[in-house]
Amino acid sequence: MTTTIAIASGKGGVGKTTISVNLSLSLALQNKETLLLDADLGMANSHILLGINPKFTLDDFVTGKSSIDDVITITKDKLKFISGGSAINNLLNLSNLERHKIIQSFNNIKKRPEYMLIDVGAGAEASSMTFMASSDKIIIVLTGEPTSFIDAYSLIKAAFLDYKINVP
């Protein structure tokens, strides 16, 4: 069974992607079958930190050009990676149905990973909340700045009160 962990933040620039990439690589280097999904849809940049340029992105899956297995890139460190794509307008405006299709597709991956980490877009957007709600655990990343604390609190409050997300 796959353990899904969403890594989220109330605001950008707090190190969420760095933590997502490093935690994913750490698990992969411990021979744990690990998949990192960059779900900062349309504005993804985990691939830059990984030093790779994926041939396919989540957009190829959403538009039906590729299967979910085809959009997985395997890094030299044996980390499986799915890019959310950069500057792809289709991914910025996904419907609820399309987001749920993405989440459901992970049940169809040929070799299911032990861990799936989701680098969620910053803030309380519907897309971020959908990925957080589908996770077993959520990590909220923040810095010592007052705005980071306030935005993290707002994200947690919105997740719990507005989206009924009650995940440890």
Write out the residue ranges for each language-model feature.
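Walker A/P-loop phosphate-binding motif and the immediately C-terminal alpha-helix
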Residues: T2-D40
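Short, ordered loop/turn segments at secondary-structure junctions
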Residues: G12, A39-L41, D77, S86-A87, ...
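Alpha-helical segments flanking ligand/cofactor-binding loops in enzyme cores
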Residues: L25, N107, M129-T130
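P-loop/Walker-type NTP enzyme "switch/lid" segment
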Residues: L37-K111
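Conserved catalytic-core segment of NTP-binding enzymes
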Residues: Y115, V120-P168
